[in-house]
Amino acid sequence: MKLKTEQAKLNSILENRAHRGICVVLEGRDTAGKSSTIREVTHYLNPQKYSVHLSRKPSRSTMKKWLAYWSKRMPAVNQIVFYDRSWYSRAMVQRLNGWCSERQYQNFLAKHKSWEQSQGVHVIKFWLSISEDEQRARIERRKKSPLTYWKFSPNDENALSYYDRMTLLKERVIDSDWHIIDYNDKRQGIYSLLETLNTTLENLE
């Protein structure tokens, strides 16, 4: 019931208030719950009011013009976009897997703040936080479940071996602008994120 109350509240905010474009960035480790969170948060929203961007491994041409690529995927006025991973992939997943060069990585660290400010949109950022033990348990459930085994890939097991390194990488970019949400209990995490999102939207100028 509490979740439905917050879902209805988000719908009301987006329907009844004029606003600049809103970016809702969801970052987190593999299995943290980014996709399922977006499904829950958007469940009752008017499809004309929002869109979802799923980030996958980028092409070489996209890698070379990383921030320019994302500039074309910003929300319009009175629109909200949910990002299942985002431009911050450069500093985390890409860096972790060696997909970007040292120069590309350092360039992102130097420019991403000013780039965000230049977009003319509100950016609300969430880190979905899970422990190493919880990530391991979720990967095992994914691997063994007849409903989710198809999602399992070698990247999932690699994620466990890179847990500490990912922690270091995310700490280089996650600052006071971010909302860190405990996702060890995913259902409670979704509620906390949605409640935080609604409060943040209500306080936007």
Q: Where are these predicted regions, by residue range?
A:
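Extreme N-terminal, non-catalytic leader segments
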Residues: 1-22
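A glycine- and Lys/Arg-enriched "phosphate-lid" helix/loop adjacent to the NTP-binding pocket
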Residues: 95-106, 120-167
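Conserved lysine of the Walker
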Residues: 34
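Hydrophobic anchor at the beta1->P-loop junction of P-loop NTPases
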Residues: 24-26
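NTP-dependent small-molecule kinase module
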Residues: 167-205
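Conserved nucleotide-sensing/catalytic segment adjacent to the nucleotide-binding pocket
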Residues: 48-109
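Post-Walker A alpha-helix
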Residues: 37-38
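Conserved nucleotide-binding/hydrolysis micro-motifs of P-loop NTPases
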Residues: 58-61, 86-89, 129-136, 184-188
